[in-house]
Amino acid sequence: MWRLKVADGGNDPYIYSMNNFIGRQIWEFDPNAGTPEERAEIERLRHHFTKNRHKGFPSADLLWRVQLLREKNFKQSIPAVKVGDGEEISYEMALDAMRRGAHFLAAIQASDGHWPSETSGPLFYVCPLLICMYIMGFMDKVFSPEHKKEMMRYIYNHQNEDGGWGLHVGGHSNMFCTTFNYISLRLLGEEPDVEAVCKARNWIHDHDGVTSILSWGKTWLSILNVFDWSASNPMPPEYWMLPTWVPIHPSNMMCYTRITYMPMSYLYGKRFQAPLTPLVLQLRDELHTQPYDQINWRKVRHMCATEDLYFPHPFVQDLLWDTLYLLSEPLMTRWPFNKLIRQKALNETMRHIHYEDENSRYITIGCVEKPLCMLACWVEDPNSEYVKKHLARIPDYLWMAEDGMKMQSFGSQSWDAALAMQALLSCNITREIGSVLNSGHDFIKNSQVRNNPPGDYKSMFRYMSKGSWTFSDCDHGWQVSDCTAENLKCCLLLSLLPPDIVGEKMEPERFYDAVNVILNMQSKNGGLPAWEPASSYYWMEWLNPVEFLEDLIIEHQHVECTSSALQAILLFRKQYPGHRRKEINNFINKAVQFLQDIQLPDGSWYGNWGICYTYGTWFALKALSMAGKTYENCEAVRKGANFLRKIQNPEGGFGESYLSCPYKRYIPLDGKRSNLVQTAWGMMGLICAGQADVDPTPIHRAAKLLINSQTEDGDFPQEEITGEFFKNCTLHFAAFREVFPVMALGEYCNKVPLPSKKK
């Protein structure tokens, strides 16, 4: 039986931590764990998911919840609430529903104070890790038979009925993910004549074979030796030797893109390929529709399957690749340039890889980069300590749920904890849940990054991190503006509560450090990006080589990051009015103006990390309301409220399709269904806009849906994925289904006047 362990570094000598592993979450298989009844319950949950898998829903992350609720012996003691047709919601009904949700949310807190949760959804994550383990010879050392069984369960559970796999859970089949999941099954030991494998292979052949896979697919298939490197556009490591004032220098790129192409350029520059094994030769035969040695690799370089293509390459980009391909690469791969320039570039690239690995405790910045950096270290020296340190951190990426084992984007520990704590604080029941708030407060304080990256970090193209919070845990090391802001908000709110209940407040200097990170992130237009200051030219997006994502070459300002930062700075100014007053006032004015400037004509805001217009509009309205903008005095607030009322469903809920993100226009869910997480966002947006003072009916209708949808134990059902990134891919935050409905009900009880049944 699989069990989750938290804040545990194990006995591996090659793993280390900045805060004693607080926030770490890893799954281990114990054949002796669990009673027969517990094992039967897990199998029932697995069977139920598989039976309903074609609904396109992600997992409800039930294995962890079952484990923790049993460990805590949680029993919901507050009776369920149902609002009848035509019945008015009383304060007592809303309070009971809110308390039921808050007590359930409190019960799924881990011993170190965070809320373990799945962060997944894309279906291209695990294949590169498996390719890496296969090439390095660690497949059976890292993954037990139970690992492999659960990975195959996950892959099969998310196979579409046509035999393919989508870019993400619930997405239409494409060549990229169908090929990746086909290869994953074969590497895990599945035979080619298995029915589901045959069905996937038929899908690939029916769509003209694997040669039309997008560029990341071409890269990994070249590494596996199922493609030839001449099928890939150039990724020269010489980029790292350019002067930083050159616009296309990697230092001017968004960090995820920079660190993805860093090891890619190393492997490309080395032209590394896996040895030809019987399995690799079989994959060549199975995936291609013509003999391998007859494929014109140069011809397929610009090919991309229709199903894969979201961001077509502009002509100027293809011209650049063709120039490098025809003129530069033939020189760099021949003497003397391969010794004088290429080798020097490879050494410089490797220096940056080692720096990034060390600074993230070998977690690396994310799951796309992890296998690439690990393989680059192995290619440099297969017996190095770098490789051993990488291997020790693989468990940090693996997550188990009722749909099987998957590779996460990386953990969302700090993000989820900040939101969960604010949800509980919104309920205003501090003494009921004091120990939970105390534990969460400790986790947040222990998760703050206390130092900048080591050495001359600016020369390594890094930004300050001292005082920040990451998206995941402290060891990850990468500052994020909204994660810093949301955790700072928690610490500021908790500092106003009795320390004997919620713990001692954070030292002022640590507040100042967090504020310093946020202030220095603001762009000239008043907005904030996610990871690093935005200073590059927008035209660089024309060079985006990633055909399935958009806006990932440079940092962009986001409504959510700006909103979170503005809220945090407003709270901070209230408690520390003398600190950097002029700078802070200027920051606030610019951020407010930015939010008003980017509002769309229909009154909405485009969200970049959640789906999409509902998410962005709630964030914008929350920040504007905290800045003193109201329905009466601000047209932007009125327009935002009008937009939310317009998209509200007849039963009171909100439901937005992920298709809003790529098409950049509001698209409702099929059948105008409602989604409870999005209902919470829409409801809170209306509350922030002051809708209760105009006409509270839309808020009451949304609250009724939340209350009546609550389960017997106080949880809420899992529905469609509600996260997204880079315009075209969804991201499953399993914690959202509890956090946001509880937060919405907390605000409803404490900000919206309700009649009382008490005489």
UniProtKB/Swiss-Prot annotation:
CDD domains listed in its UniProt record: SQCY_1
Record keywords, A-Z: Isomerase, Repeat
UniProt feature coiled coil, ranges: none
EC main group: isomerase
Catalytic activity: (S)-2,3-epoxysqualene = isomultiflorenol
PFTB repeat windows: 148-189, 588-628, 637-678, 699-743
Active site: D482 (proton donor)
Purpose of the protein: Oxidosqualene cyclase involved in the biosynthesis of bryonolic acid. Converts oxidosqualene to isomultiflorenol.
Additional note from the record: In cultured cells, IMS1 mRNA expression is high between days 16 and 20 and precedes the accumulation of bryonolic acid.
UniProt similarity note: Belongs to the terpene cyclase/mutase family.
Protein known as: Isomultiflorenol synthase
Record organism: Luffa aegyptiaca
